[in-house]
Regions:
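Membrane-interface coil-to-helix junctions
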Residues: 45-139, 168, 177, 182, ...
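Membrane-embedded helix bundles of polyisoprenyl
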Residues: 134, 138-147, 155-199, 207-252, ...
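Perimembrane helix-loop-helix junctions
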Residues: 239-282, 356-367
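Membrane-interface helix-loop junctions at the exits of transmembrane helices
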Residues: 49-54, 159-163, 167-176, 287-298, ...
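Periplasmic/ER-lumenal interhelical loops and adjacent helix-loop junctions
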Residues: 67, 284-360
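Signature aromatic-anchored transmembrane alpha helix within multi-pass, membrane-resident enzymes
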Residues: 246, 279, 384, 434, ...
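C-terminal luminal/periplasmic domains and tails of membrane-associated envelope-modifying transferases
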Residues: 493, 530, 534-778
Length: 778
């Protein structure tokens, strides 16, 4: 079959081109301009639709957000929305009575302050997270275009460059932490550094001098706006922007120095002006942090994990997950690196960078980009610092250690402030792509019209699976269902009848979806809850939570509060008659409640009980235990108890007649531990700092009772008075943390945990059963 001439591509293009040029010049210009700006509008909308379910922009769809980190962020907004303005940036509903600031729940102070004035006009269920995502994608494309347009051969290639800068997978991968999708702030900073004219000295005197100072300070004013807005969004982004701004300060300050006849000559007027112009942006950044709530009494400045959430040296070309690249093979990373350190460029942009490097080395035309690269030199020192902090003290390349060392004690606390250090290479990543685009623009200004679309096609093909995964993450927004774990209407009645909601254990992560759904109801009625997952925990609130859990173990709860179990937990005998169950959740209704509810039923318990911070074993602990760690829990002294509802344990062998108890435990120093079960001594354990398995027989009566009461007594090996607490500085947390922090400044002869044990897991099994496998490494 032969195509007619008018349908052949060459002829078709020639005909269209001839007809276009036959139009009046004004019409041609209007069509070109309209098409250009139309594409500028459509491109970010298509990018948004590629990575998000478009229903997220419906502000009344809240159910999709009540999960993982999103739940923390939207609850912070909902609680603050229902507080009076007198609390400013603070609310006392989440983690009552101490509460949280907008920053401690990562609730986007910028949008929170924007929407709160209209709270009486907003729907009862309202979220701005979806609108924020759309806003960020549009702003990202806008600043990408502003950044690249002065260096592109034409406005069409500038659009291609803006799409390339907006097609980085790491931008959309951070949707779980919505404020970190504001990576357009980095592009804004690079635009100010690269494209905006440097400030100059003011002229004249008096009012003319002042007006000239502001008129000649466009870059300073730009940084004032940028640092303030960034400070209202997220401190990590502010740290990155500060590196770009710091590079500009370095350029202007040291640019005033030059060598004349082997002597260093400095223009002190320029240097003084540079210092003075640095003050307003810095001051506004501090003000923004204050408004958002970064400076709060009791808030821990940092958290553990520096070195775990680092940037892997293969991050730019490792997709991490098989579905995240259709071309390159993924290499699994440590849990923290695979999230915070994820910065895969996409195969299309990898080709872009490689092509730019090859052209820069081999072609003279690319050397014209040297002037552009030379202007970036002041960023060298700040970006090296960012890179080293991001890589951390544990650098890896495809899972192999490049270096690994212990941080000096003096650096541990400062490093904890930036524990999610893998993010800090974002400015470097964006500058890498910008530089590659400029090199290609300068070396192949005509061919780029073909090369850049090819790069974008390859990029789209490579990350299509990643795009689908991101859309799936927001797919619940397509439903108007609000509650998934707590659908019964009785929950609304119970919350209305109560003066607050208390959760046990006070650990949101044990069942975050249950917590978020009930807490949304509570905060919507301005009812306080006893706990909250915060970006930086408040040590005073932690002490309150621990005291509240100890009170529950003694049978003391607030009778006018709704008491909710995040996992099924044993309760003191005096509270059992009040226990009820709704939607499979164990609760104690508030006093005076007439809601008809069924009594609780135990789901079978595993015969192997673990005591990590997310394990059900933490529900079985009595008093004298510290906050659980990821793999176990320390007793707070030489005596500690726990209770196992033995009647509801599902054993590997049906109806066993006898049982043995195998414990995995360790201690801080060699100790002898006596173990009692239901008041009867069943054996002893010799524990050391190395975790060991210890098997003890249980009395026949253990299977006849309702509860297995286990008691540990540590036999001290040496006199208490000579046991000295470790001198290594540690981050204080747990029961009485705020008080212990103050007491730590005084010499304390005994560390309670030094006399305790760490319980990792317990296995109950018949004697003839094979020995249990070790479940955790020591």
């Amino acid at each position: 079959m032969t195509l007619p001439n008018w349908l052949r591509p060459g002829q078709l293009f020639a005909n269209l081109n001839a007809r276009f040029h036959a139009l009046p010049p004004a019409v041609r210009k209007g069509l070109v301009t309209g098409t250009h700006w139309g594409l500028c509008v459509i491109a970010p909308l298509l990018l948004f639709a590629a990575f998000f379910d478009i229903n997220v922009v419906n502000p009344t769809r809240v159910g999709w957000l009540l999960d993982e980190d999103w739940g923390q962020h939207v609850l912070g907004w909902n609680a603050w929305r229902h507080m009076p303005w007198s609390t400013f940036n603070h609310e006392t509903l989440l983690g009552a009575p101490v509460g949280n600031t907008l920053f401690s729940t990562d609730s986007n102070p910028l949008f929170a302050f924007l929407f709160k004035p209209f709270r009486d006009f907003l729907p009862a269920n309202f979220q701005y997270n979806g609108l924020w995502f759309l806003f960020c994608v549009v702003m990202h494309f806008t600043f990408a275009y502003k950044l690249i347009r002065p260096h592109a051969p034409g406005k069409w290639t500038a659009i291609g460059g803006a799409i390339a800068l907006s097609a980085l997978p790491m931008l959309y991968y951070r949707m779980r932490h919505d404020t970190l999708v504001a990576q357009w702030l980095i592009l804004w900073g690079l635009h100010l550094f690269i494209n905006v004219r440097d400030d100059t000295l003011p002229e004249g005197s008096g009012l003319r001098f002042v007006l000239s100072w502001f008129g000649n300070g466009q870059k300073m004013l730009g940084y004032c706006a940028l640092l303030f807005v960034t400070g209202m969004i997220h401190p990590y982004l502010l740290f990155m922007i500060a590196a770009i701004w710091g590079g500009d300060c370095i350029k202007r300050f040291f640019g005033a120095m030059r060598i004349v006849e082997r002597r260093l000559v400095a223009d002190w007027k320029v240097m003084v002006d540079a210092v003075i112009r640095a003050m307003p942006p810095l001051a506004l950044a501090i003000v923004a942090l204050y408004i958002g709530g970064s400076f709060t009494k009791g808030m821990s400045p940092g958290a553990g994990g520096y070195g775990y959430y680092s940037f892997p040296m293969d991050g730019w070309f490792n997709p991490v997950k098989p579905e995240f690249s259709a071309i390159l093979k993924a290499w699994p990373l440590d849990g923290g690196q695979s999230f915070e350190g994820y910065q895969y460029l996409g195969f299309g942009l990898i080709l872009l960078v490689i092509a730019a490097i090859v052209l820069y080395i081999t072609t003279p035309e690319a050397k014209t980009a040297r002037s552009f690269i030379a202007r970036l030199r002041p960023l060298t020192a700040p970006f090296i610092i960012l890179f080293l902090i991001a890589v951390s003290n544990h650098a890896q390349f495809y899972g192999y250690d490049v270096w690994k060392f212990q941080l000096p004690d003096a650096l541990r606390q400062p490093a904890a402030v930036l524990r999610a250090s893998g993010r800090l290479t974002w400015p470097i990543t964006y500058l890498l792509i910008v530089t590659a685009l400029v090199v290609l623009f300068r070396s192949r200004p005509k061919a780029i019209a073909v090369l850049l679309p090819l790069v974008l096609v390859v990029q789209a093909y490579d990350i299509a699976g990643m795009s689908r995964a991101m859309r799936k993450a927001t797919s619940l927004a397509s439903s108007d269902q609000m509650y998934y774990q707590t659908p019964s209407p009785e929950w609304d009645q119970l919350v209305t009848l109560s003066k607050g909601v208390d959760f046990y254990p006070a650990n949101v992560h044990m069942n975050d979806k249950l917590f978020y759904e009930l807490t949304w109801r509570a905060t919507s009625q301005a009812k306080p809850v006893n706990t909250m997952y915060a970006a930086r925990e408040n040590l005073i609130q932690v002490a309150n939570q621990e005291a509240g859990m100890d009170a529950f173990k003694r049978g003391e709860i607030k009778s006018d509060h709704l008491f909710v179990f995040l996992k099924q937990c044993d309760a003191p005998s005096e509270l059992w008659p009040r226990l009820r169950m709704l939607d499979g959740v164990w609760i104690i209704p508030p006093k005076g409640s007439t809601v008809d509810l069924q009594k609780p039923e135990w789901s079978p318990l595993r015969s192997e009980v673990r005591f990590g911070w997310l394990d059900q074993g933490t529900c079985l602990l009595d008093e004298n235990w510290s906050r659980p760690e990821y793999d176990g829990v320390w007793s707070e002294g030489p005596k500690a108890n726990l209770r196992i509802p033995i009647r509801h344990v599902e054993f590997d062998a049906p109806s066993p007649k006898k049982l043995e108890m195998t414990l995995k435990a360790k201690s801080r120093q060699p100790v002898l531990v006596t173990v009692l079960v239901n008041g009867v001594k069943v054996g002893e354990m010799n524990l050391t700092p190395r975790a060991t398995l210890n098997t003890l027989p249980l009395p026949a009566s253990a299977l006849r009772g309702e509860t297995l009461r286990i008691r540990f007594l540590v036999e001290e090996q040496i006199d208490e008075d000579v046991i000295v607490a470790p001198v290594t500085p540690v981050k204080l947390s747990g029961r009485g943390a705020a008080e212990r922090e103050a007491a730590a400044k005084v010499t304390v002869p005994v560390d309670a945990r030094a006399l305790g044990i760490k319980l990792i897991n317990i296995k109950l099994a018949p004697p003839e059963a094979p020995a249990p496998k070790t479940v955790l490494k020591s």
